[in-house]
UniProtKB/Swiss-Prot annotation:
UniProt record, GO biological process: coenzyme A biosynthetic process
UniProt site (Transition state stabilizer): H21
Keywords: ATP-binding, Coenzyme A biosynthesis, Cytoplasm, Magnesium, Nucleotide-binding, Nucleotidyltransferase, Transferase
Assembly and binders: Homohexamer.
Catalytic activity: (R)-4'-phosphopantetheine + ATP + H(+) = 3'-dephospho-CoA + diphosphate
Recorded metabolic or biological pathway in which this protein acts: Cofactor biosynthesis; coenzyme A biosynthesis; CoA from (R)-pantothenate: step 4/5
Similarity-based family: Belongs to the bacterial CoaD family.
Name under which the protein is recorded: Phosphopantetheine adenylyltransferase
Binding annotation for substrate: T13, K45, L78, R92
């Protein structure tokens, strides 16, 4: 791996993508030469939006930010996807201590599977540390504004989802 072309993967379900995710993406771009947003098609995790729509929402956010980041959906082991993308770094965001426990375990497993791929943890910024996709979906489901947590485009998808769900 050429150190002058460091590729990083920022994986997640992005169900939906929030300002917390965007914060990590912007900061991760400073650490790598090329960042790939890996939208996971996790069969063990029930998602509200399908992978195609989650990928589309992430792509729209990247276009809005005018940053050079690739968005790719993947399925299966994260380290396998990272290797396929020639990545040397996996970037994970941490909101709280509870995130660290899980993420630390996953980084250890990933290291055992592919030691040449490192994991970097980025703590959430103070103003995004309590944003979670689950909270955003619940607030939207209850009919409240989520404009402080997600973009207008994501808000529209949540409104559409809740409109369909109430029919």
């Amino acid at each position: 791996m050429n150190i002058n072309n460091r590729i990083g993967i920022y994986p997640g379900t992005f169900d939906p993508i929030t300002f917390g995710h965007i914060d990590i993406i912007k900061r991760a771009c400073k650490l790598v030469d090329r960042l790939i947003i890996g939208v996971a098609e996790n069969i063990n995790k029930h998602t509200t939006f399908d992978a195609k729509l989650r990928t589309s929402m992430a792509e729209n956010e990247i276009k809005r930010l005018e940053i050079d980041v690739d968005v790719v959906s993947f399925n299966g082991l994260l380290v396998k996807f990272a290797k396929e993308q020639n990545a040397s770094v996996i970037i994970r965001g941490l909101r709280a201590v509870s995130d660290f426990d899980y993420e630390f375990q996953m980084s250890w497993v990933n290291y055992k599977l592919l030691p040449e791929i490192e994991t970097i943890f980025l703590p959430a910024s103070e103003d995004t540390q309590f944003i979670s996709s689950s909270f955003v979906k619940e607030i939207a489901r209850l009919g409240e504004s989520v404009s402080k947590f997600v973009s207008v485009g994501v808000q529209k998808e949540l409104i559409n989802l809740n409109r369909i769900g109430s029919e």
